[in-house]
């Protein structure tokens, strides 16, 4: 019933729409739902943090220390999801329905297998990980309590994101947004009930926030499967005659790798920033955790728009339509630039209000307001670099796409942070973000221009 309720009804077949609909209108249709979905996806941790901060600053620090682990889990989910999305969109562009269905089955198997593995790994690394970042026994115990429950979110998280990307590849962008909304609503409603023990619910503290998160992901997975198994889906699970194809698994990993790197590097980056900040105070770690959730909400919401452009570019690359490929890139870049300017202005003008969401102490506000304004400047260049990386990904230029993300979120950032922190102390840490994004944009533009000179379209040749 859920599948019938949210099924997008169109008079035009999706493949025809991707090939002939006006590019500007098509990007809006394809991008708004994943934009909202990414906003909702990254609101989970922000919602948890906002409620948990009302327990204590130590509780906020605990959730902040857990953020790199949960971000790495989300990155793995997006890795499989985007790899499957790119392949399915390409196959549909080439009118290879059977290959698209086989890709669906492989994607689901990978989601469950890798999800179970990450569940186990997160449970194994918790103690040494949290022990490395705090000597405060209360923060350590709160971190363990939160992450011991959140570890079990990975299978439902990977499964529902994989299905979300499969359905988006067919042009149906509304249905995935619906089951995403359902999960966030559950998390938002049950967070205060389980954290503070409202009504008949027990007061579980920080553990209650984790239970609400897992419940939200579980509901999203159930609704996603109900949709995928509906009769009117353009891709289906192929069981008859199915056998694992190693080359296809490798293709999924390869095509989704740039998106994984973009998301996973943020996890490693937060870990390294925490190593710098631990020399200053637990409050500095709590602040950066709060700020980074705001940043991720802005950046990853824009990334949702970018991911809406990806299947359009990929489809027309598969169909050999150079003009529509480039038109989608130009229009998408203009939209991303506008949204990043809006995000920059929001953080620069309202830093105190944003910190207020996390019940910030006077100590945190004393340096946090100026730090947020400094780091917000980086948004102006971040969107352009990410859009260039996505274009390279859509046209199967995987290594240059990955290189841009490596430079932006790790190699250049850590290098600038190390040097500027030596010169300017904690202010140098904040300044390293806009400096890195500016340098990455210049390098990404050079990589993009070099790639355009050698770019070739597949013109209907097979995608494998």
Question: What do these predicted ranges mean?
Answer:
Residues 39, 43-61, 130-137, 193-204, ...:
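Helix-terminus/linker motif at the lipid-water interface of multi-pass membrane proteins
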């Amino acid at each position: 019933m859920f599948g019938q309720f949210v099924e997008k009804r169109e008079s035009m077949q999706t493949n025809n729409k991707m090939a002939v609909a006006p590019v500007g209108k098509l990007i809006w249709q394809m991008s708004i739902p994943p934009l909202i979905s990414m906003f909702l996806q990254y609101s989970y941790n922000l919602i948890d943090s906002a409620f948990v901060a009302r327990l204590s600053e130590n509780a906020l620090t605990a959730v902040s220390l857990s953020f790199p682990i949960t971000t790495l889990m989300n990155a793995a989910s997006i890795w499989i999801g985007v790899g499957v999305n790119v392949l399915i969109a390409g196959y549909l562009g080439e009118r290879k329905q059977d290959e698209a269905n086989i890709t669906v089955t492989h994607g689901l198997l990978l989601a469950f297998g890798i999800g179970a593995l990450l569940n186990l790994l997160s449970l194994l690394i918790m103690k040494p990980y949290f022990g490395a970042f705090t000597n405060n026994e209360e923060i350590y115990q709160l971190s363990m309590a939160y992450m011991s429950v959140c570890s079990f979110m990975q299978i439902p998280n990977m499964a529902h994101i994989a299905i979300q990307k499969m359905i988006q590849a067919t042009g149906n962008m509304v249905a995935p947004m619906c089951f995403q909304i359902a999960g966030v609503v559950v998390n938002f409603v049950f967070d205060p009930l389980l954290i503070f023990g409202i009504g008949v619910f027990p007061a579980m503290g920080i553990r209650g926030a984790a239970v609400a998160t897992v419940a939200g992901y579980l509901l999203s997975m159930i609704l996603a499967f109900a949709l995928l198994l509906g009769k009117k889906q353009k891709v289906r699970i192929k069981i008859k005659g199915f056998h694992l194809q190693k080359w296809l698994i490798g293709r999924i990993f390869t095509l989704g790798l740039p998106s994984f790197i973009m998301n996973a590097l943020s996890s490693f980056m937060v870990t390294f920033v925490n190593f710098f900040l631990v020399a200053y105070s637990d409050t500095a770690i709590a602040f950066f955790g709060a700020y980074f959730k705001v940043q991720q909400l802005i950046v990853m919401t824009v990334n949702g728009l970018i991911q809406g452009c990806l299947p359009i570019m990929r489809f027309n690359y598969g169909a050999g339509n150079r003009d529509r490929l480039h038109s989608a890139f130009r229009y998408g870049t203009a939209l991303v630039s506008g949204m990043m300017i809006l995000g920059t202005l929001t953080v620069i003008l309202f830093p105190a209000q944003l910190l207020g969401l996390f019940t910030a102490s006077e100590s945190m506000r004393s340096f946090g307001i100026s730090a947020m304004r400094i780091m917000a400047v980086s948004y102006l260049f971040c969107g352009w670099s990410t859009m260039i990386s996505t274009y390279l990904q859509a046209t199967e230029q995987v290594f240059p796409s990955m290189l841009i993300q490596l430079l932006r979120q790790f190699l250049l950032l850590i290098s600038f942070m190390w040097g500027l922190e030596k010169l300017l102390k904690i202010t140098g840490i904040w300044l390293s973000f806009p400096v890195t994004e500016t340098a990455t944009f210049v390098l990404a533009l050079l990589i993009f221009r070099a790639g355009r000179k050698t770019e070739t379209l597949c013109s209907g040749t097979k995608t494998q």
